Regions:
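Sec-dependent bacterial lipoprotein signal peptides
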Residues: 1-17
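Acidic, polar-rich low-complexity tracts and alpha-helical solenoid repeat scaffolds
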Residues: 16-264
Length: 264
């Protein structure tokens, strides 16, 4: 038993005094640089970051700054430290405008912001920022190496914003808050013209306006039903084969029945 404990302690000491720990404690930056390259090859990014944090300030303004900066940013990105990777990539772009890695850094900085975008149900401040950063890259490098990927990320983020806006409007509708629902769906249709939720929004706008009309004072019903009819005509013109077509037709039949019964 005692021999086992001794061996265990020796193993722990061996690990604690291994090459990485030696480099971490060393005052020789060349030792740290060599270990960083080894760790990056082995994809041990967290350990590499620890060493980078020790030496990066000492190499700013030197011939090695450019190569170290891009490696540091990549290591941060691979550890999913996206706020810091975004910062380091953007700093690289500003500090090394003539670098061959400038386009790569510009894209990866924007992609770091993309990863900070929250799910659609939460605040989309980071999504807006990521879209702006990706658009900056696309504008700067329209035929760039990463342009296709950047456009794909933009589409994903726009879909997220579309969904958030649509779900907010739909929530008003389902809670029978027809005035804000109508306003929200109208804004959605204008502000999200290419959205996959467009026929959904157009249908719920009809339904919201129709139900709002029915809850109105008698003298206001005709005018509000006319607006629902206008929304219906737009809907069937744009989406004649929509999954909501039958429901929309039923609303229109109800509107016509109401007009007949009330001599409108």
């Amino acid at each position: 038993m005692k021999n086992y404990i001794v061996l265990l302690l020796l193993a722990i000491m061996a690990v604690s005094c291994g090459p990485y720990q030696t480099a971490l404690k060393s005052t020789d930056n060349e030792v740290k640089l060599a270990m960083i390259d080894t760790l990056l090859k082995r994809e041990k990014y967290s350990k590499a970051v620890n060493l980078f944090d020790q030496i990066i300030p000492q190499y700013r303004g030197t011939d090695k700054a450019e190569a170290l900066s891009i490696k540091y940013a990549k290591a941060l990105y691979e550890t999913r430290d996206y706020p810091n990777s975004a910062y380091q990539y953007e700093r690289f772009v500003q500090s090394h405008p003539a670098s061959d890695n400038r386009e790569y850094a510009a894209f990866m900085g924007a992609k770091s912001h993309y990863h900070m975008s929250a799910v659609y149900s939460k605040s989309q401040v980071n999504t807006d920022r990521a879209l702006a950063k990706l658009q900056d890259y696309i504008n700067l490098y329209p035929d760039g190496e990463y342009a296709e990927q950047a456009n794909g990320l933009v589409s994903e983020l726009r879909f997220k914003l579309d969904r958030k806006a649509y779900e907010i409007a739909k929530n008003y509708h389902h809670r029978n808050r027809y005035i804000p629902a109508i306003k929200s769906f109208e804004n959605f249709i204008v502000q999200h013209p290419g959205s996959e939720f467009m026929d959904d929004a157009q249908f719920y706008l009809i339904d919201s306006q129709y139900l709002y009309a029915l809850k109105s004072r008698n003298e206001l019903v005709p005018e509000r039903l006319e607006l629902a009819t206008k929304y219906y005509n737009t809907f069937v013109s744009r989406f004649p084969t929509s999954e909501y077509r039958e429901d929309a037709d039923e609303i229109m039949e109800n509107i016509n029945d109401y007009k007949i019964k009330n001599n409108i």
